[in-house]
Amino acid sequence: VDLDRCYPTAEEMEPKVKGAFAWLDETGSASNECWADYQKKLAAWTANRAKFEAFLADFDEFKERVAPWVKKPEYIADCMHKANAPCRYSVLNFPVDEKTVRWAITYCHLMRNRFSVIDLLHFTGVWNDEFVQMLLDRAEAMDAGL
């Protein structure tokens, strides 16, 4: 992991965040609200760099510790199918079209001040269009997703 690349500046991220949500309304209030929240998360991420470095140093131990609680997507999809739960965005009570699903998944990490594994994937350079497509393809192979 290139640590320096894991820490974009506010100047780098502001146009990305605002651009992702600009289409939601003409006034820009939605994109401004997302940026207001996101910049807090970005500042906290930057302030905690030493903790991330320690996490990386102990990553193998971390993986062993959490492995018993991590379930494979295939297991979760199988449980959902067995429960007759909706496994596709298109069959929800309020169906979501493919374009909106792709947008929501691609930019979900930019909308709020709540750190998730997707933020970690983004900051380490993993979360991109190709990765999102891989997730959608994997979901499709499980009769889930779009």
Which sequence ranges carry the predicted segments?
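C-terminal charged capping/lid subdomain of soluble metabolic enzymes
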Residues: D2-L146
